[in-house]
């Protein structure tokens, strides 16, 4: 499943296609969204926000389209008038004079008012997004030490969107390798230096992955600057200590680590 950096880049592509342009046609597959087609035609997409793995498409009339791709949903950008060759089921079409964005296969789609944005169940549960430039290491450290999270093992905590939105499995293993910790640790047991290192890595690594335009694939690379240190590298030598990277399962997900330098 895509993680925060991949979802933010997808949102960037959608924004580049239609942001600031009047919508010439709007279509929704679900009956409960049909009344909004006429309300949105002629409006402008002002921005597309990511909240973890959810996208919020904000319109100039104050409405917001909430969508969560879950496992199968995917957005596409096409030239207006193009007919895509796909077997996927179309859910949303937002069309401008020159570009159209399409959402396929997703089922978690809603239209929200400004008030509903503050009470939506998923948006209430999800933590601050690691790609939100306003989020600081000091705030992350405070969350780590909060009563809600301080006694949670990192193996599960770093997959929990309520802690920090946008993290996922490859980020989990890369962050823990960066700070030299195993997944069994808890924030309450770390010393000050470890807490500070982890608080920075929880933001630095997702942001580096995003800015270097990498993607999680078998090439193990995230652009020119971000390269997987342990993810999908079991059996290889750790570049930090020379130990052999191992693979196990933690919190029902594959976990890669170096037993020689992660303690």
UniProtKB/Swiss-Prot annotation:
Transmembrane segments: none
Entry keyword Lyase: yes
GO molecular function annotation: class I DNA-(apurinic or apyrimidinic site) endonuclease activity; damaged DNA binding; oxidized pyrimidine nucleobase lesion DNA N-glycosylase activity; zinc ion binding
Domain of life per record: Bacteria
Pfam families: Fapy_DNA_glyco, H2TH, zf-FPG_IleRS
Catalytic activity, reaction form: 2'-deoxyribonucleotide-(2'-deoxyribose 5'-phosphate)-2'-deoxyribonucleotide-DNA = a 3'-end 2'-deoxyribonucleotide-(2,3-dehydro-2,3-deoxyribose 5'-phosphate)-DNA + a 5'-end 5'-phospho-2'-deoxyribonucleoside-DNA + H(+)
Coiled coil stretches, renumbered: none
Name listed for the protein in its UniProt record: Endonuclease 8
Top-level taxonomy: Bacteria, Pseudomonadati, Pseudomonadota, Gammaproteobacteria, Enterobacterales
């Amino acid at each position: 499943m895509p993680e925060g950096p991949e979802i933010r880049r997808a949102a960037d592509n959608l924004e580049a296609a239609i942001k600031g342009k009047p919508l010439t046609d709007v279509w929704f597959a679900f009956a409960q969204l049909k009344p909004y087609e006429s309300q949105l035609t002629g409006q402008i997409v002002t921005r597309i926000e990511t909240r973890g793995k959810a996208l919020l498409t904000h319109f100039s009339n104050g409405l917001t389209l909430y969508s969560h791709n879950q496992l199968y949903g995917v957005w596409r950008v096409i030239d207006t008038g193009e007919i895509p060759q796909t077997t996927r089921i179309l859910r949303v079409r937002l069309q401008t004079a020159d570009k159209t964005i399409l959402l396929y296969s997703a089922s978690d789609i809603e239209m929200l008012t400004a008030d509903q944005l503050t009470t939506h169940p998923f948006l209430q549960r999800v933590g601050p997004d690691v790609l939100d430039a306003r989020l600081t290491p000091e705030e992350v450290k405070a969350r780590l030490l909060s009563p809600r999270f301080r006694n949670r093992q990192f193996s599960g905590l770093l997959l929990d969107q309520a802690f920090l939105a946008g993290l996922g499995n490859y980020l989990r293993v890369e962050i823990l390798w960066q700070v030299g910790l195993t997944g069994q640790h808890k924030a309450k047991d770390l010393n000050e230096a470890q807490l500070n290192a982890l608080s920075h890595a929880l933001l630095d690594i997702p942001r580096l992955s995003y800015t270097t335009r990498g993607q999680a694939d078998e090439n193990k690379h995230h652009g020119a600057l971000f390269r997987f240190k342990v993810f999908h590298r079991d059996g290889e030598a750790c570049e930090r200590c020379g130990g052999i990277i191992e693979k196990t399962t933690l919190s029902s997900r594959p976990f890669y680590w170096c037993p020689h330098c992660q303690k």
